[in-house]
Amino acid sequence: MLVCFLFFYDKFPLLFLIIFHTKSLRKDFKFRYICFLMKKAVFSLLCISLGLHVHAQNTGKDIYRPEQEQINNLIDTKLDIKLNFDNQSIDGKEWLTLKPHFYPTDSLTLDAKNMLIHQISLVNNNGNTTPLQYDYDLNQQKLKIKLNKTYTRDQTYKIFIQYTAYPEGVPGRDKKYYSKDKGLYFINPQGKNSYIPTQAWTQGEPMDNSGWFPTIDSPNQKTTQEISLTVPKNFVTLSNGTLTSKIDNANGTRTDNWRQTQKHAPYLFFIGVGDFAVVEDQWKGRPVNYYVEPEYKSVAKEIFGKTPEMLTFFSEKFGYEYPWDKYSQMVVRDFVTGAMENTTAVSHSQTAQQKHGELVDKNVWEDVIAHELAHHWFGDLVTSESFANLTVNEGFANYSEYLWREHKYGKDYADELREEDLEDYFSGNNFHKDLVRFDYKKVGDMFDRVTYNKGGYILHMLRSYLGDDAFFESIKYFLNHHEYQKAEAQQLRLAFEHVTGKDLNWFFNQWFFGHGHPKINVVTEYKPNEVVVNLKQTQSPLFEFPLTIDVYENGKRTRHKVWVKKEPLNTFKFSTQGKAQLVVVDGINDIVVEFNEEKPVDLYVQQYLLCKDELPSRMQAIKKLAYNQLISKNALSTLITAMKDPSAGIRKLAIESLDVTDSVVQEQAEEALAKIAESDPKTLVRAEALKKLAQIDKDKKYLNLFKNALKSESFAVKGAAIDYLSQNAPEELDNLSEDLDIKLAVNSPRLLEKLIPQWRQENKINYFPELNEMAALYALMPYIKPEYAKASQMAFDWILSTNDLASTQAIAKVYSNYYKFMKENQKEAIPFLRAMANNALELKQKTYQQYPNDDLKKQIEVLEEVINEIKD
C-alpha cells in the first residue's frame, strides 16, 4: 500500500507526495507512499512565535507483537452482498470453508466489526444447514462460533453467516465520519453533493475488511474467493479475479459475480462501485483495464498506459511471470491512503487523475503505479506473515519504483528518487526503529519511512554487494518457494544464502533486525603522493559494510573497494601519482548512511565536474555550491554550468538554487535563464527558469516570452506565465480566467487572490477539492510559502463558512493525518495544529448559528472529533 500525504506537489515543496508505495506515508498521507516533511526550523519558529512548550518523546520496548496464532485456516470465502446506499449498510450472506491448522478444535473465532448477526449455520455436504451457537461481542469486534463437533486438521467444514454490516457504525452507536478503519466507504451515497460522484469502495489493509464481511482478518491467512455484488444498475463494479456473470434484476439493480481461484490474504479483498469510465487495455491476452471518472477517460492511458510494459518488465526482472488473471486499476474519491494493491483490482486516490497539461510535465503517479504492481509479487503472491515483517512487502514495492525508473529512464532519474526517499527517512524520527520490529504500539505505526524507504534501499545495498545476477536469482528463488504463502525476513535471508552460498546473518542482523544507520564524520587528508580517508562512526550501534572510495587524478577515477569495520574509527590510505584532485566517499552511492564532510568550494566544483556518472555526487555538489554563490565566483559559474546538465533534475535544482535577488547572480544567469525558459526540452525546467525570470524582470523585458509561455500545453509553464502576468500584465488574462482550470489557478497565488472572491460569489464549491488542503493549513503559509498566505486565508474563510460536509471532512482528514505524523516526528507542533483545527471549528459554529441545520451540525461534530483526537 502506498501511504502519502496528498499535498500540492511543486506548489508547496515542504508539503509533498511521497509515493509512498506508499501504499509512504503509501498508507496515510509513498505514496509519492509519499510523506509529510516539515523542517525543524519551521516548527521551531512556529513554537517560538506561539510560545509553545516542547515535550520530549518517551520510548520503550515493553511490547511484543507476534504473528497471529493460526487455529483455523481459511480455504474459501464466498460472499453474496447487497450495497444499501440509503443507509450506508451491507446485507450480506457468507459461506466460509475452513479447516484446523494443526490442533483439533471445536470452535471458530472471526473478526467482525460493526455488524448485526442474523444467523449462523453449519453447511453439510448435501447442502443442508444446522444452526450453530455463537456469541458476538460488538465491543471486541469478535464473533465466536461453537462448532457442531471437534474437527481435526484433515477435516474441512463450511459455515453460513447472514449479517448486516454498518461501516459507519451500528445504529444507536457513535458514527465514524472520517475514520480510516471502516473497511467499506460510501462516498456521497445519497447524491446530495453535486460535485462529488456517488461511489462505494473498500480498503482492507491493515485489518479492516472485517468491517464488511466476517473473516480471520490476519495477513497469515490465505483464501480463494467469490463475490456476488448487487448494486444499482447504472453503476460499474470491480472486484478481485474474473467477472463471471452479470444479471439484471427486476428491481433496477444488477448482480455481478467475481471469482478468484488463487488464494490471497483477506486484507486484499476489494469491491469498488460507482459511475466509472472503463478504458480497456491488455497484456498477453489478459485484461488490463483502467477505471476513472468519465472526465478523465481521454487521458486514462496517459496516466496508466505504461502498465503493460511494467508487467513485462517486472515479470522478467523477478524471474516469475505475473501470476494473476487480470490487472485492473480504479481511481476512487476521498481515498484514505495513496493506493492499495488489492489483488488484480488496485485502488488509487483521486490524485492519480491528472489533466493532460499536468501529464505533459510529469506523471506524478507513475512511481505509485509501479509500486502497486510490484506488490502483486511482494505482498499478494508472497505475503508478510505479520505486520512486524511488513518490509517484506513494502520494502520490495518501494525499491521496485527505483527499478522501474532505472529501466525506463536511466540511472540518474532512479537516483533522484533514491535521494528523495533517503532524505525523507533521515529527516524523520526513525533512527531508533528496527526495520523488522515486534514492539510497535499500533499496526499503523509500521507504515512509515523505515518500512518503506529504508527497507527499499537496504535491498539496493544487498544488490550492490551480491551483484545483479545473484540478487535477482535470489528473488526468483524466494518467490517460487513461497508462492501463495506467507513469509518473513528470515526466509528472505535464507533464499539469498541458498542462491549465493554466502552467510548473510551479519547483513540482516544489523540492517533488518537492528535499528539505525551509519552516521560518519569524514576527514580526508590530501598528501603529495597519498590520500588518507578517516571515517569516524558517531552513532550507536556501530556498523560494518563494504564501501567504495573514488580517487580522482588528472580527471581519471580509480575506484577502491574497502570494508568498514565495526570500529569507531576506520582509516584508509591510497597511493597517488601526485596530489589527488578529489576524493569521493561512497562513490557509487549505495549505502544507507549519513556523511558529515566539509570540503573547500573548489573541491565541490571538481566534484560536480568529475562525477559525470553519479547524480547524487553532482547533486550534493550543487547544494553545497548554492550556499557559496554570493562569495565565490567558481561556485556561481558552476551553478550556471549545471543549468545545462544532462539530467533534468540537476538542471532544475541548479536553477532553483540561484539567488537572483543578488545583482551579480542576475547579471551572470539572466541570459542562460532566458534561453532555458524558451527552449529546454523539459517543461518543469522551463517553468523553473520562468519563475526566476519573473523575479528579475521588473521592466517587462520578457513580457513576450511569458505571453508565449501562456500558449504552452504544460501546466507548469502556463502556471508560471499566469503568475507573472497576473502581476505585470493582468489584461492578458482577461479572456483566460473565465475558463481557467482550477489546477492551473492554484499555481498562481496572485490570481487566486483575485479569483477566490469571484468564485465565492458564484458559489463554485466544486473547486473546494483543490483548495481544501491549502485552506486547512492557512496558518502555516506565512512561514513556508508566504506568497500563498493571503489566498489560503481567503480559502479557509470561504470553505469553513459554507455548508459543505465533504470539504469539512477533507479538512478534518488533513488535520488527522498531520497529527499522526507529528506525534511521531514533531510533537512540538501539535498545539499549533490543534489551534488551526479550533479556528476551523469556531468558524463553522458561527455559520451554524446563522443557518442552523442538520448538515452543519454534523460538520461541527466532524471537527470536534478531530480536535479530540489531537493530543499532546
Enumerate the language-model features and the residues they cover.
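Short, solvent-exposed loop/turn and secondary-structure capping segments
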Residues: 169-184, 238-241, 268-270, 339-342, ...
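Bacterial Sec-dependent N-terminal signal peptides
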Residues: 1-60
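Non-catalytic accessory/interaction domains
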Residues: 231, 246, 374, 482-671, ...
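Hydrophobic alpha-helical and helix-loop surface patches within well-folded domains
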Residues: 38, 54-56, 69, 117, ...
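Structural detector for internal amphipathic alpha-helices that build alpha-solenoid repeat scaffolds
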Residues: 591-593, 618-630, 641, 651-664, ...
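Acidic/His-enriched low-complexity segments
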Residues: 56-323, 449, 464-466, 482
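Amphipathic alpha-helical scaffolding segments comprising HEAT/armadillo-like alpha-solenoid repeats
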Residues: 598-607, 631-643, 663-677, 698-710, ...
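Short coil turns that connect the paired helices of HEAT/ARM alpha-solenoid repeats
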Residues: 610-613, 643-649, 678-684, 710-716, ...
